[in-house]
Amino acid sequence: MLDKQLLDILVCPVCKGTLSVDKGHTELVCDKDKLAFPVRDDIPVMLMEEARKLEADDA
């Protein structure tokens, strides 16, 4: 599980907007840019190269 304090300070590296945790706690999602950043071993990977573009059915 991700640390609440860490989630409070993390922002999207593209737009600097807020991130939300997906239901499975496996990704951090930027709704504005429609990007999902993976969480591996409870560590967010905030690299654009690792981000997944969200499809319409992912929302």
Swiss-Prot record:
This is UPF0434 protein Mmc1_0910. InterPro entries: Trm112-like (IPR005651). Pfam families: Trm112p (PF03966). SUPFAM superfamilies: Trm112p-like. Belongs to the UPF0434 family. GO terms for cellular component: cytosol. The lineage of its organism: Bacteria, Pseudomonadati, Pseudomonadota, Alphaproteobacteria, Magnetococcales.
